[in-house]
Protein backbone atom coordinates (compact mmCIF):
# COMPACT_ATOMS: atom_id res chain seq x y z
CA UNK A 1 0.00 0.00 0.00
CA UNK A 2 1.16 3.52 -0.66
CA UNK A 3 0.43 6.37 1.75
CA UNK A 4 0.36 9.66 -0.24
CA UNK A 5 2.00 11.73 2.50
CA UNK A 6 4.86 11.44 4.97
CA UNK A 7 4.55 9.47 8.20
CA UNK A 8 6.48 12.22 9.99
CA UNK A 9 3.54 14.56 9.42
CA UNK A 10 1.31 12.27 11.47
CA UNK A 11 3.58 10.68 14.07
CA UNK A 12 4.29 13.33 16.68
CA UNK A 13 7.59 12.75 18.54
CA UNK A 14 6.33 14.36 21.75
CA UNK A 15 3.34 11.97 21.78
CA UNK A 16 5.07 8.74 20.72
CA UNK A 17 4.06 7.13 24.03
CA UNK A 18 0.39 7.36 22.94
CA UNK A 19 0.76 6.27 19.34
CA UNK A 20 -2.61 5.74 17.65
CA UNK A 21 -2.52 6.40 13.94
CA UNK A 22 -4.55 5.55 10.87
CA UNK A 23 -3.18 5.97 7.37
CA UNK A 24 -5.61 5.94 4.46
CA UNK A 25 -4.13 4.22 1.44
CA UNK A 26 -6.03 4.99 -1.78
CA UNK A 27 -4.98 1.74 -3.45
CA UNK A 28 -4.37 -1.86 -2.47
CA UNK A 29 -2.73 -4.61 -4.46
CA UNK A 30 -2.04 -8.23 -3.71
CA UNK A 31 1.41 -9.58 -4.43
CA UNK A 32 2.22 -13.27 -4.51
CA UNK A 33 5.35 -13.86 -2.49
CA UNK A 34 6.96 -15.80 0.27
CA UNK A 35 10.42 -17.29 0.14
CA UNK A 36 9.53 -20.62 -1.52
CA UNK A 37 7.06 -19.00 -3.91
CA UNK A 38 9.50 -16.29 -5.00
CA UNK A 39 12.32 -18.76 -5.58
CA UNK A 40 10.05 -21.18 -7.47
CA UNK A 41 8.67 -18.41 -9.67
CA UNK A 42 12.11 -17.09 -10.62
CA UNK A 43 13.56 -20.56 -11.20
CA UNK A 44 10.64 -21.27 -13.53
CA UNK A 45 11.35 -18.01 -15.42
CA UNK A 46 14.95 -19.20 -15.84
CA UNK A 47 13.78 -22.53 -17.30
CA UNK A 48 14.15 -24.61 -14.15
CA UNK A 49 11.80 -27.13 -12.59
CA UNK A 50 11.21 -25.87 -9.04
CA UNK A 51 9.63 -27.94 -6.28
CA UNK A 52 8.47 -25.47 -3.61
CA UNK A 53 8.02 -26.76 -0.08
CA UNK A 54 6.24 -24.92 2.69
CA UNK A 55 3.27 -24.68 5.00
CA UNK A 56 0.19 -22.64 4.14
CA UNK A 57 -3.22 -21.98 5.61
CA UNK A 58 -6.85 -22.21 4.60
CA UNK A 59 -6.56 -19.15 2.33
CA UNK A 60 -4.10 -20.79 -0.08
CA UNK A 61 -6.54 -21.63 -2.89
CA UNK A 62 -5.95 -18.49 -4.99
CA UNK A 63 -2.16 -18.86 -4.70
CA UNK A 64 -2.42 -22.58 -5.54
CA UNK A 65 -4.28 -21.70 -8.72
CA UNK A 66 -1.55 -19.21 -9.64
CA UNK A 67 1.15 -21.86 -9.15
CA UNK A 68 -0.76 -24.31 -11.31
CA UNK A 69 -1.24 -21.66 -14.02
CA UNK A 70 2.54 -21.20 -14.00
CA UNK A 71 3.04 -24.99 -14.14
CA UNK A 72 4.72 -25.01 -10.72
CA UNK A 73 3.84 -28.16 -8.73
CA UNK A 74 2.38 -27.77 -5.23
CA UNK A 75 2.36 -31.37 -3.99
CA UNK A 76 5.07 -30.60 -1.40
CA UNK A 77 3.09 -27.71 0.09
CA UNK A 78 1.34 -28.64 3.33
CA UNK A 79 -2.01 -26.97 3.97
CA UNK A 80 -3.22 -26.41 7.55
CA UNK A 81 -6.99 -25.86 7.24
CA UNK A 82 -7.40 -24.35 10.72
CA UNK A 83 -4.88 -21.52 10.17
CA UNK A 84 -4.28 -18.64 7.78
CA UNK A 85 -1.13 -18.39 5.71
CA UNK A 86 1.54 -16.04 7.08
CA UNK A 87 1.24 -12.61 5.54
CA UNK A 88 2.74 -9.19 5.61
CA UNK A 89 1.22 -5.77 4.96
CA UNK A 90 3.64 -2.97 4.16
CA UNK A 91 2.65 0.68 3.88
CA UNK A 92 5.19 3.00 2.26
CA UNK A 93 5.08 6.79 2.45
CA UNK A 94 6.38 9.36 -0.05
CA UNK A 95 9.86 9.27 1.54
CA UNK A 96 10.03 5.45 1.20
CA UNK A 97 9.64 4.96 4.95
CA UNK A 98 7.72 1.81 5.73
CA UNK A 99 5.40 0.50 8.42
CA UNK A 100 5.06 -3.28 8.35
CA UNK A 101 2.56 -5.59 10.02
CA UNK A 102 3.37 -9.32 9.93
CA UNK A 103 1.13 -12.24 10.85
CA UNK A 104 3.13 -15.47 11.23
Language-model features, listed with the residues they occupy:
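Residues at secondary-structure transition points
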Residues: 39-40, 60, 94, 102
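Short active-site-adjacent helix-start/loop capping segments
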Residues: 2, 59-62, 85-87, 99
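Generic secondary-structure signature for well-ordered alpha-helical cores
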Residues: 45-48, 72, 94
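Conserved phosphate-binding/catalytic loop of the ribokinase/pfkB sugar-kinase fold
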Residues: 75-80, 88-104
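Glycine-rich phosphate/adenosyl-contacting loop at the front of the ribokinase-like
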Residues: 1-53, 62
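Active-site-proximal loop->helix
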Residues: 58-71, 75, 88-92
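Beta-strand->loop->alpha-helix junctions that form or flank phosphate-binding loops
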Residues: 53-58, 75-85
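Gly/Ser/Thr-rich helix-start
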Residues: 34-38, 55-58, 89, 97
Amino acid sequence: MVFPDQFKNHILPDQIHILNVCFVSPELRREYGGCAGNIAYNLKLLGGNPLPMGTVGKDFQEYRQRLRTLDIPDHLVRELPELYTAQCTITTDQDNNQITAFHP
